[in-house]
C-alpha cells in the first residue's frame, strides 16, 4: 500500500511525461521516447518538442513499463520496470550524457506529482492482505483515514468522517457506486460486484485537484481491472469457512450459532488472441454463503438476546396458526443460504501504434437475507425477514487515440443496468402482524415496506476528453454526460399492517390499528414512479511543469442538470403553501474550480497541496421521494379499535386458507382508498430554491524519504460544505414560545398540510483531519507500515436513511428544526493502523508469507437524550409530528457528546507456495484469520457500539447499558483455501 500524492483520475489509464535535457541542462528537442509494456510488448513512441518536453498518455494501468530515451549524438537513457497505477501521471525527467548510457531502475509506484491526499493499493497488496471477505474494503482500510464500519455487516466505507453515501466507486471508468442510494456499502449490489482477482490496482482519493473528478464529495474509490498479455496467465482459487471455524465465546459468554458451511471459488484467464495486437481477460467468482440470525429470546444463548420469553413467542406462533391459519416460521432460525455470482470479460485491441480499443462486460447477481425490524426492542419470526439483492449488468467501451506526439483523446461509453430485489421470505400473501408486549414488539408475516417494493435503474455515461502538450503545459478539455432513468415502486401497507396491544388481544382478534395504503385504483403498480435526469459537465485544465521541481495544476469544471420529469402537482398543497410541489433538478448548475501543486523541495522531500470545490454523491432516493410522496395517486388509511372477525374482506389471494384478517384487506379501507380519503403520509417536496450541494477541500501534505529507506507521509485536509442537503418539516411554524420543561423547548404549530422538504442547510458540513504514515522495507523480507489519523467531522443532519421521515427523525436534537453543527455519526476521532508483511524462502524457491493488519479506533459517538414520557410528553407534548422517543437532547448543541468505546483488532494471513505442474506455475495454500485478537483471548477484539440512531438516556449510561456488544465483528473467523497460478 502506498499513501500516494500522485494524480489518480476517474479513468483507466496512466501517463508518463517529463523533460529531456543534455548533461549541461539544455533542453533536447527531437529526442525519441519509447514506452514499452512488459506484458503486451506494445510500444508507444513520441518525440520531445522544442522545450525538450514529452507526454505519453493512455497507457494501460496496473502493469510495468520500460522507457528508453534516444537522441542523435547522445547516449541512451532507460528506465526498467516502472510500475504505473491507475490514473497515475508520472514525471520522468532525463539528462542524456555524452559519455555513457544512463540506466534508471524503477521498482515501485513513484510519487513525483501531487494533486491531493490519496492511497494506492497495487496487485501485491490485493493478493497478500488478509482479506477474509475478498472485498477491496478489506484492503483500503489499511489507510487510517478510511474506516470500514463492520458493526452491521455492510462494511460501509467512511472517508475522513463523511457519510458513506457521498463516496463514488469507479471500475474501468464506469461509475459502480450505489446509483439509487439504498445500500450503505456503497455498491449497487449486496457485495463487491466484480471478481476480486480481476482487479490490478485500487486508488482512493480524498481531495483530487483534477477537473476530471466528479460525482462525489467524500472520496473516490477507483479500481482498474487486469488485461491480457502475450503470455497466457491465469489462476484458480477455492476457500472454505464454517461454524466450526468461527468463535463461540465472547468475554466468557458462550455464544450459540447456527450450523453453516460457506464456499467460494473462482478462476481467471488472460492472454493474446493475436500477439501484440488483440488481448483477452476473464474472471469468474461464485460464493455460496450463509446469513446468520444473531438474535434470540432470553436464555437462548444468541449473540443478541431480545427481552422476550420463548414461551411468549411460542404462544404467539400457536395463535397465528390456530386462529389466523398462518404459519409464522421459526424463532430460532437456521442460517439463510445465499448465492453471489459474478464475472468480468475484457478485450483490448491495439488497432495500431496510435489507437487502442478496450471493451469490458461485467455481471453480478447476488442476494442476502436481512431482518426487517432488528432493533433491541423488536423480535421477528424468520418469515418476516426479507430477501434483498440486485442483478447488475455493465458494458464499457473505451477508445484511446494518439493523433500525434502532442494530442491524444479518450472517448468512453458505458451502460449500467441494475434490477433491485426486495422480497419477503414468507411470500406476499399475508399482512404484517405486530404484537406489542411490555418491552418488545413481535413481528410476523410480511414486512410493511416489502409489500410493494420494486426498483430498477439505468445509467448511461458518455465521456469525451482530449489532452494537448504545448512545451511544459498539458491542456486537458472534456465533456461528459451521465443520464439516469429510475423506476421506483415503494408504498407501504398495500397488504395491510395490523397492530395488537398484547397477546390476549391478538388471540381475540382485537386490533389496536389496521393500516392500509395503495394507489387509488387499488392496484399497487399505479403507485410507481418513473423519472430521470442528466448531468452534463464541461472542463478545462492546464498542467504546468514550471521547472524540474515545481508543477501546478489549474482547472475549471462546470456541471449542469437537465430533467423534464416533474412530480405530480397536489392542488391541496398549492392552495395551502402558495406554490407548487413540482420543483425538480432541472437547471441546477455549479462552477467547480481546482488548483493543485507539487514541489520537490529537495531530492528527499516533496510538498503538495491544493484547493478545490466538489459536488455529488447525494443519493437519488432522496430526490425520488419527491416523486413518490405527492399524495395524488395513492392514499394511506387506518382504522382503530377493530374487531377483525367482524370485518368484510376483499383482495384475498385465491390460495388463501380463508378470506379474513391478514389474508385480505378490510373492505371499508379499500373503499376509502378508492375514494381518495385517508390520513396520508407527509407530502415530500423539493425546495423551489434548492441548490446543488458542494464542498470545498483544502489539502497540504508532504513525503519525506530519509535514513535507510524510511518514507514518512503527512497530510492535512480541511473541508467546508455549502448548501448541504437536509430534510425539514415544511409545515411547522415557531410560535415564539418555549415549553417550561427543562431548558425550554421551542413550541411549534403545524399550520399547513404536513410535509417534509428537501432543502439546503444554512450551515454546511465541515471536517479537519491530520494523517501520518511511516513505511520501511527491510532487506530480510520484512515490510512495515504504521499509520495514524485524527479526524474532527461535523454535520447538521447525518442523513442516515432513504426516506424523508427516517432522515428527519433518526438523529438527536433539541429543536427539531435546528441547523446546528455537531459531531458527525461517522466521525472516528482517532485511528491507528499497522501492516506487517514478512516473506521468506524456507522451502527453496517457494515463498512463505505472513501478513498482519491491525487497527485501533476510537468508537462511534452517541448522544445523551431524554427517555420515555420525557421525550414525548414533557418536551413537546402529544403531537403527531414530534412523537420521538429517545431522540430529544437534554441540552442544546449536545448531539453525539459522548465518546464510543475503542475497538482494537488484528487480522492475519499465512500462505505457503508449493510447486506446480511446470517451473513457472505456483500453487499456494493459505489461512486467513479475521480478528486474531479474539482467537487468542475471547476478551479481546470485542466491539461495543450504541444502538442506532445513537441516542442513550442518562440512566443507561449510569447502568453501563449505553453500548451493546456486536457479535459478528467481535467473533474470530477462519478461512482456509488454496490457489494455483500460472
What do these predicted regions represent?
Residues 49, 74-76, 80-95, 103-227, ...:
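Periplasmic N-terminal accessory/gating domains of Gram-negative outer-membrane beta-barrel systems
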Residues 709, 802, 843-887, 900-907, ...:
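C-terminal beta-signal and adjacent terminal beta-strands/loops
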Residues 233, 258-367, 387-409, 413, ...:
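Transmembrane beta-barrel wall of Gram-negative outer-membrane proteins
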Residues 211-214, 228-233, 274-277, 354, ...:
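Short loop/turn motifs that connect adjacent beta-strands in outer-membrane beta-barrel proteins
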Residues 566-592, 596-758, 885, 901:
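Solvent-exposed loop/turn elements at secondary-structure boundaries
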Residues 709, 713-861:
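Gram-negative outer-membrane beta-barrel transporters
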Residues 8-103:
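Periplasm-facing N-terminal accessory domains of Gram-negative outer-membrane beta-barrel systems
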Amino acid at each position: 500500500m502506498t499513501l500516494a500524492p500522485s494524480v489518480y483520475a476517474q479513468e483507466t489509464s496512466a501517463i508518463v511525461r517529463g523533460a529531456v535535457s543534455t548533461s549541461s541542462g539544455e533542453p533536447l528537442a527531437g529526442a525519441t521516447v519509447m514506452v514499452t509494456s512488459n506484458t503486451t510488448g506494445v510500444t508507444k513512441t513520441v518525440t520531445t518538442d522544442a522545450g525538450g518536453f514529452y507526454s505519453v498518455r493512455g497507457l494501460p494501468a496496473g502493469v510495468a513499463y520500460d522507457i528508453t530515451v534516444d537522441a542523435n549524438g547522445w547516449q541512451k537513457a532507460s528506465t526498467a520496470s516502472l510500475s504505473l497505477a491507475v490514473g497515475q501521471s508520472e514525471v520522468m525527467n532525463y539528462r542524456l550524457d555524452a559519455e555513457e548510457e544512463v540506466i534508471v531502475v524503477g521498482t515501485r509506484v513513484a510519487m513525483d506529482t501531487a494533486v491531493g491526499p490519496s492511497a494506492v493499493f497495487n496487485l501485491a497488496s490485493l493478493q497478500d492482505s488478509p482479506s477474509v471477505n475478498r472485498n477491496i474494503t478489506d484492503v483500503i482500510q489499511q489507510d487510517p483515514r478510511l474506516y470500514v464500519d463492520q458493526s452491521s455487516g455492510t462494511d460501509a466505507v467512511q472517508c475522513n468522517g463523511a457519510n458513506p453515501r457521498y463516496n463514488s466507486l469507479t471500475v474501468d471508468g464506469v461509475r459502480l457506486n450505489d446509483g439509487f442510494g439504498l445500500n450503505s456499502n456503497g455498491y449497487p449490489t449486496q457485495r463487491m460486484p466484480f471478481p476480486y482477482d480481476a482487479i490490478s490496482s485500487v486508488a482512493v482519493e480524498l481531495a483530487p485537484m483534477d477537473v476530471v473528478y466528479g460525482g462525489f464529495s467524500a472520496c473516490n474509490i477507483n479500481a482498474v481491472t487486469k488485461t491480457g498479455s502475450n503470455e497466457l496467465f491465469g489462476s484458480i482459487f477455492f476457500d472454505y469457512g464454517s461454524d466450526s471455524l468461527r468463535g463461540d465465546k465472547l468475554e466468557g459468554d458462550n455464544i450459540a450459532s447456527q450450523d453453516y458451511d460457506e464456499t467460494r471459488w473462482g478462476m481467471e484467464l488472460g492472454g493474446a488472441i493475436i500477439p501484440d495486437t488483440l488481448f483477452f481477460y476473464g474472471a469468474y467468482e461464485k460464493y455460496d454463503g450463509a446469513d446468520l440470525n444473531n438474535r434470540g429470546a432470553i436464555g437462548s444463548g444468541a449473540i443478541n438476546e431480545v427481552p422476550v420469553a420463548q414461551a411468549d413467542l411460542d404462544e404467539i406462533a400457536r395463535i397465528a396458526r390456530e386462529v389466523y391459519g398462518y404459519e409464522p416460521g421459526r424463532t430460532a432460525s437456521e442460517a439463510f443460504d445465499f448465492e453471489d455470482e459474478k464475472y468480468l470479460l475484457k478485450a483490448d485491441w491495439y488497432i495500431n501504434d496510435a489507437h487502442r480499443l478496450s471493451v469490458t462486460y461485467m455481471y453480478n447477481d447476488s442476494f442476502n437475507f436481512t431482518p426487517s425490524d432488528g432493533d433491541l426492542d423488536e423480535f421477528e419470526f424468520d418469515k418476516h425477514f426479507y430477501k434483498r439483492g440486485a442483478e447488475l449488468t455493465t458494458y464499457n467501451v473505451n477508445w484511446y487515440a494518439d493523433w500525434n506526439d502532442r494530442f491524444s483523446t479518450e472517448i468512453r461509453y458505458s451502460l449500467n443496468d441494475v434490477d433491485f430485489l426486495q422480497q419477503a421470505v414468507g411470500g406476499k400473501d399475508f399482512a404484517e402482524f405486530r404484537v406489542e408486549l411490555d418491552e418488545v414488539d413481535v413481528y410476523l408475516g410480511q414486512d410493511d415496506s416489502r409489500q410493494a417494493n420494486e426498483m430498477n435503474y439505468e445509467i448511461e455515461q458518455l465521456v469525451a476528453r482530449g489532452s494537448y502538450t504545448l512545451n511544459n503545459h498539458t491542456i486537458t478539455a472534456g465533456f461528459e454526460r451521465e443520464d439516469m432513468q429510475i423506476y421506483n415502486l415503494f408504498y407501504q401497507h398495500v397488504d395491510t399492517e395490523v397492530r395488537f396491544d398484547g397477546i390476549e388481544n391478538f388471540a381475540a382478534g382485537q386490533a389496536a390499528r389496521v393500516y392500509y395504503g395503495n394507489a387509488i385504483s387499488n392496484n399497487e403498480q399505479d403507485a410507481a414512479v418513473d423519472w430521470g435526469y442528466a448531468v452534463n459537465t464541461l472542463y478545462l485544465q492546464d498542467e504546468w511543469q514550471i521547472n524540474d521541481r515545481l508543477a501546478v495544476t489549474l482547472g475549471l469544471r462546470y456541471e449542469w442538470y437537465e430533467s423534464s420529469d416533474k412530480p405530480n402537482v397536489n392542488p391541496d398543497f398549492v392552495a395551502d403553501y402558495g406554490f407548487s410541489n413540482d420543483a425538480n433538478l432541472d437547471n441546477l448548475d455549479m462552477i467547480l474550480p481546482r488548483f493543485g501543486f507539487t514541489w520537490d523541495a529537495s531530492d528527499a522531500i516533496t510538498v503538495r497541496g491544493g484547493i478545490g470545490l466538489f459536488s455529488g454523491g447525494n443519493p437519488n432516493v432522496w430526490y425520488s421521494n419527491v416523486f413518490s410522496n405527492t399524495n395524488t395517486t395513492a392514499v394511506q388509511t387506518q382504522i382503530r379499535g377493530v374487531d377483525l372477525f367482524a370485518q368484510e374482506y376483499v383482495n384475498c389471494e385465491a390460495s388463501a386458507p380463508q378470506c379474513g384478517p391478514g389474508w385480505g384487506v378490510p373492505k371499508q379501507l379499500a373503499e376509502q382508498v378508492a375514494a381518495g380519503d385517508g390520513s396520508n403520509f407527509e407530502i415530500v417536496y423539493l425546495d423551489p430554491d434548492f441548490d446543488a450541494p458542494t464542498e470545498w477541500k483544502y489539502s497540504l501534505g508532504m513525503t519525506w524519504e530519509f535514513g535507510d529507506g524510511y518514507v514518512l507521509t503527512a497530510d492535512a485536509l480541511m473541508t467546508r460544505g455549502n448548501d448541504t442537503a437536509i430534510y425539514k418539516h415544511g409545515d411547522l411554524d415557531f410560535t415564539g414560545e418555549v415549553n417550561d420543561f427543562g431548558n425550554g423547548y421551542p413550541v411549534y404549530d403545524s399550520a399547513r398540510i404536513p410535509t417534509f422538504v428537501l432543502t439546503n442547510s444554512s450551515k454546511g458540513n465541515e471536517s479537519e483531519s491530520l494523517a501520518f504514515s511511516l513505511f520501511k522495507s527491510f532487506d530480510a523480507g520484512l515490510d512495515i507500515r504504521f499509520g495514524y489519523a485524527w479526524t474532527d467531522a461535523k454535520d447538521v443532519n447525518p442523513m442516515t436513511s432513504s426516506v424523508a421521515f427516517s432522515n428527519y427523525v433518526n438523529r438527536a436534537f433539541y429543536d427539531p428544526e435546528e441547523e446546528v453543527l455537531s459531531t458527525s455519526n461517522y466521525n472516528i476521532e482517532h485511528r491507528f493502523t499497522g501492516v506487517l508483511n514478512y516473506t521468506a524462502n524456507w522451502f527453496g524457491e517457494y515463498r512463505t508469507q505472513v501478513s498482519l493488519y491491525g487497527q485501533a479506533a476510537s468508537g462511534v459517538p452517541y448522544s445523551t437524550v431524554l427517555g420515555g414520557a420525557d421525550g414525548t410528553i414533557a418536551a413537546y407534548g402529544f403531537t403527531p409530528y414530534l412523537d420521538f422517543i429517545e431522540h430529544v437532547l437534554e441540552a442544546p448543541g449536545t448531539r453525539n457528546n459522548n465518546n464510543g468505546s475503542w475497538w482494537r483488532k488484528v487480522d492475519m494471513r499465512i500462505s505457503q507456495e508449493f510447486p506446480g505442474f511446470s517451473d513457472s506455475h505456483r500453487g499456494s495454500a493459505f489461512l486467513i484469520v479475521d480478528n486474531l485478537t479474539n482467537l487468542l483471548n475471547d476478551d479481546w477484539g470485542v466491539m461495543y457500539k450504541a444502538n442506532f440512531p445513537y441516542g442513550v438516556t442518562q440512566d443507561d449510561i449510569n447502568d453501563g447499558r449505553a453500548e451493546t456488544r456486536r457479535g459478528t465483528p467481535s467473533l474470530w473467523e477462519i478461512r482456509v483455501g488454496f490457489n494455483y497460478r500460472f
